[in-house]
Amino acid sequence: MKTGIIGAVAQEVELLFADLEASGTPVTKTTIGSLEFHEGILDGCPVVIVCGGVGKVNAALCTQILVSVFSVDAIVNSGSAGGLDPRLRVLDMVVSTDAVHHDMDATWFGYAPGQVPGTASPFFTADARLRNAAQASFERVAAGIRASLEGSDTVPAMIEGRIASGDLFVADAATRAR
């Protein structure tokens, strides 16, 4: 299975680029528009990694190129995000059960908040196979990460839940509650 990995900013993918280069396998770099896609083998798995820029439009552009040009089977978003769940801490991994647009509003046309016109629901259910793979991957590396952070207040955890995506930065209590 070939996996596409998207990071919005350089800090979210630079270690992945370095690991790919250090893997000892050939790395192909392909430029499409202003984007550079790095294709190779990471930990025995074929991957294509891209730093795509911030926002849903950039993520959609990268996703379409990864599917149409590189024929990836799955897409993973790597990087930081805001956290609406008070349990979340730095280094935690969030595995999506489903996703929703938090800034989509077609309610005037009779749709639910977050629902894209023409879809049956505002929620996009995550692929169970990919969720299971993410859980298994986390468990494989969690012990080593925890051991390296022994004595630290930051111990990574895996949390499953709904991911709300949008281009609106959530910085106030009213938006957060919505």
Regions inferred by a protein language model and the residue ranges of each:
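N-terminal short beta-loop-beta anion/metal-coordinating cradle
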Residues: 1-64, 70
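Short active-site-adjacent helix-start/loop capping segments
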Residues: 13-14, 56-59, 83-87, 103-104
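A glycine- and small-aliphatic-rich helix-loop capping segment at beta-alpha/alpha-beta transitions
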Residues: 19-26, 68, 89-100
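Solvent-exposed alpha-helices and their adjacent loops that cap or buttress functional pockets
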Residues: 40-43, 68-69, 86-87, 154-156
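Hydrophobic alpha-helical elements and their junctions with loops/disorder across both membrane
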Residues: 66-67, 141
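Structural motif
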Residues: 73-74
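Mid-sequence, gly/pro-rich, charge-dense loop/helix-turn segments that line enzyme active sites
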Residues: 84-178
